[in-house]
Amino acid sequence: MKIFFITSNASKVQLANERLNRYGIEIIQHKADLIEPQVFDVETVAAEKAKQLLGIVKTPFMVEDSGIYIEKLNGFPGALMKPVLDAIGDSGLIKLMSGESNRNALVKSVLAYCDPEKDLIKTFTGNYNGSISESIRGDMTRGWKVAKIFVPAGETKTLAEMDDMEWQKFLGDFRKDDHYEKLGKWLKSAFA
């Protein structure tokens, strides 16, 4: 089965292929101009992006959106992570958390799968709990916008501080039930 991934990010396509090939799914990059909905909820953003493409893309496709929800900030910035980080950076988020003891945060990633022939949009969510560090730490972003300030649950290092072995352990834990895994399992059962 082939699915278009509507993204300009080739690294996302490579990751999707790594994750979904074992389910017999080939991911092909396709670029399209999308209006990014400026709403708080990543599920809404992913579904709205998929709806924009329903009449344009004729074969199965998927879009992705991610956000970080900081508990003490009532979930801010959520799906607005990219524009917020572009505006205030990691240091701005750290400053917003100044003096706060509750630094809990949730990284949420959503894939919206769309089959235009069936007029179907289905979303798959992956969550990862952690906290916001008190300072910017580490050098490796590893493709995560919040890598220098996000500390995974049960860890003491930010993602950017992790060595390769620690990073692989984190990925292994994250991937057990992430959005790619959920999509792959669903497609396997739906088209078996």
Q: What role is predicted for each listed range?
A:
Residues K2-F4, S11-A192:
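Anionic-ligand binding patches
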